[in-house]
């Protein structure tokens, strides 16, 4: 009797949880109509990107980012700063056939963290980098050598980090 009640309770919990999860993460298809929006985000020293974000780090105005994406996805793009970290990604949706490019100022950045299939392209020399981290199928590439005294580089999954560094101490964590 106890087993039957336990199984019934577990089945009821699954029946409630599965539709709630599916509703929270709906799938959107990119419209193909690309729009651009500039957002004031304040100051930050680290950037964390997830989802399908392609983040271009370069000589852009400080304190703001520019988001380029399909018009129907713009409201789902998160660009928020908490504890000095700019977080970029999509909120509560998965996407198909979509673009998400975010232009981020290089000034003052010390740490980059790419997750999922996010990609960072470093367009300008960066000084003072202390950490690069990529997980999942994420990618970090740099057009110019990084200038740093101490840096930790960590890649997991099928992630790829391709950078040159002029450094005092470089620690590779895999």
Locations of regions flagged by a protein language model:
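Intrinsically disordered, low-complexity terminal regions
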Residues: 1-174
